[in-house]
């Protein structure tokens, strides 16, 4: 997409709640799985080049094709962690895989965090409203503020 096309397309897809712009989840997981790392990187670069966003937050899981290539493009990677044995085993496996694939730069960018749990009984925009102004929302805003201060 060209810059004008991207801005128009994004404008039609972006939803906003309390000064937080976000793209709603995809309708089909296959859309995520079939997107290559190169396509993700190209899209993100266009957003950086042609939008006014200061921060882009990605919620990535293992269903993203070529995840490690995409993670290599990130300046900071926040990994929410839990202390239970299953979660710890998954983290160890992930870190081991990064080491085997010689992705030390990705490992170095990871910041393990323990964000507060968010619970809401509402759905849709009510849920997003609750999320933005919850303890979790405060936690994320503070993380972003510290990142800006630290450069």
Pin down the residues of each PLM region.
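Phosphate-binding loop that captures ATP/GTP phosphates
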Residues: 1-22
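Short, flexible/disordered intra-domain loops and linkers
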Residues: 1, 33-34, 125-126
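Residues that form generic nucleotide/phosphate-binding pockets
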Residues: 13, 46, 139
């Amino acid at each position: 997409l060209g810059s004008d096309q991207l801005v128009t397309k994004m404008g039609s897809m972006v939803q906003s709640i309390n000064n937080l712009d976000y793209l709603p989840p995809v309708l089909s997981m296959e859309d995520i799985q079939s997107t290559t790392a190169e396509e993700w990187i190209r899209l993100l670069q266009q957003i950086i080049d042609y939008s006014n966003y200061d921060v882009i937050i990605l919620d990535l899981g293992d269903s993203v094709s070529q995840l490690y290539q995409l993670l290599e493009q990130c300046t900071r990677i926040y990994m929410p962690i839990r202390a239970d044995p299953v979660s710890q085993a998954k983290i160890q496996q992930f870190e081991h895989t990064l080491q085997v694939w010689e992705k030390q730069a990705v490992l170095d960018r990871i910041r393990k965090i323990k964000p507060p749990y968010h619970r809401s009984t509402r759905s849709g925009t009510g849920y997003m409203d609750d999320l933005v102004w919850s303890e979790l929302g405060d936690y994320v805003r503070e993380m972003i503020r510290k990142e800006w201060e630290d450069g």
